[in-house]
Amino acid sequence: MSSYSAQLREEQQAVSRAYDRLDALRAQARSRLDTVRAAGSHGSPTQRTERDSFATMYEDRLTQLRAVEDRLVFGRLDDVHGAHRYIGRIGLSDEDHEPILTDWRADAARPFYEATPSNHGDIVMRRHITLSFREVVGVEDEVLDVHSDQVGEASSNGTLTGEGALLASLNAKRTGKMTDIVATIQGEQDRIIRADLNQAVVVQGGPGTGKTAVALHRAAYLLYTHRRALQRSGVLVVGPSSTFLHYIDQVLPSLGETGVVSRTIADLIPGIIATAHDDPYAAKLKGERRMAKAIANAVAARERVPSHLPVIRINGFNVPMVRADIEQAIADAKRTRQPHNKARETFVRDMLSAMRNRYVERLDYEPEQAELNDVMQQLRMNDDLRKTLNLAWLPMTGEWLVDQLFAKPQQLRRFAPWLEERDIETLMRPKGSPFTVSDVPLLDEAMELLGPDPKAVARQKALDAKRAEEEQFAKDTLAQAGIGSGIVTSQMLVDNINGMDAELTAQRAAADREWTYGHIVVDEAQELTAMDWRMLIRRCPSRSFTIVGDVAQTSALGGTRSWRRMMDPLFGERNWQLNELTINYRNPKEVSQLASDFASSEGLYLSLIHISEPTRPLYI
């Protein structure tokens, strides 16, 4: 048996041990879950609540353990003392709590990504392990300490490489699931992945520099490192297409994370289906930042004094609607700084009070409260008054407002006066036309200014009341059991009752337009317009972003060709950082050099890419 085969056999033993432990933990979690479920619904409320809590915990554990089946182990670190540390997708220990596998996101795994021959600490060798299902099919070593005895061993074993493991992994046959991204990270990517949560990190890189790997790894790493902060808010990943999002859905679970919402710009608003596309010039016009002003103008125009004011008949008295009353009610409603539909409640309330006071002025006696209540009821039921109040402060939906804006040229002229006639002709379309992808940020802008549908507000209030009732019930049961100050809190029990794990958090976030995320990852970000960015920042007020793209590849007319020109107005000059990936592992040196020469001659943006040494071509 060759030395290389012996290395494979040695690693197979370690990998098999890790999988055996994984199987044992799965069986243990399954057994405990079955025991809890077998208890049924018997017992006191406290006992049932605790069973629900434990059942959810075991279900979550099973989901986590199942998600890391593929390529459980992918690396090993050897230190100066001769100890081995295996790196994988999850942390595992044996029954005596001795470590078997180190989670790739733990600090102990950092050298696997960051160590270099010039800065390796106590690590002397890094080994990359390749699996096919549960079988070890390849190992490659990087000796980080040239004075180590392991240099000769790795050379004689046929496992020694320089950057060969990374190059081999990146040049290997690529699959739709991109499932080998963990083992391809190198130092410059790792620093980006582990950057602080509360900032905007822009990753600029040309083709083949691993931008997408950085984006997905950063999402998984942040979910792991900041899981308390992100468990209830979640992470949003915005990609260029549904195909890309399918990749994400396949890759992130294999990293041990599932609580991520993945969307394109087109399907970011729940209930809105936008499949049509504008021509490039129309899309550019709709993507300009000043279109937010057009939407604001369209909303403000629906807060006005109608030209005709009726006289309302109440209990035999003619009570006229007075212009000054409407103007005052509009001013008071605007001062609330509430969205249009919410502020309308203040406007209507003030107008009803004003009309009641006008009625009282016509009386020669002091009315009883019962009469005043009756007058208010009559006012609420009066058709003429209701129509006039609607004309003065029209309740609207975002869909209706945007549809009207592009169906009537006079509205575009009025609300977007900077548009030229040819621009207006480009944007016009028949009323009721399907919404386009470029409409989605405008719809979101309108919905933000208008506020939620009153019916949706009522539903949310009912849900909040139900949750408060459940939490009170949990507190009462804990108090009765005498464990109110123990390790299980009422909040934990309510969360488990409602299944508020990461996956359900993602489901709730995806269904709520007003949900604010703890972090947003954007791939192919150079294609986004200013209005796209407004929509995304609205969903992450903390401005915690990972932004990935290549401004040299921008194809959209409304996209960005300068990160600074786009990012400074959004985040502020000092609140975002630009990181450039400089290693190209995909393209041969000759191809990349030719592309660089052409870009320079044409005055195009040029990434500072260090091109790796050529490797043996892989034919697929």
Name every feature range the model reports, one short phrase each:
Residues 1-5, 9-25, 29, 40, ...:
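P-loop NTPase Walker
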Residues 1-182, 186-191:
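Extended, charged low-complexity regulatory segments
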Residues 186, 190-197, 220, 390, ...:
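Amphipathic, well-packed alpha-helical segments that form the structural scaffold of globular domains
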Residues 196-199, 205, 232-234, 246-415:
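Conserved ATP-dependent motor core of P-loop NTPases, especially the RecA-like helicase ATPase domain
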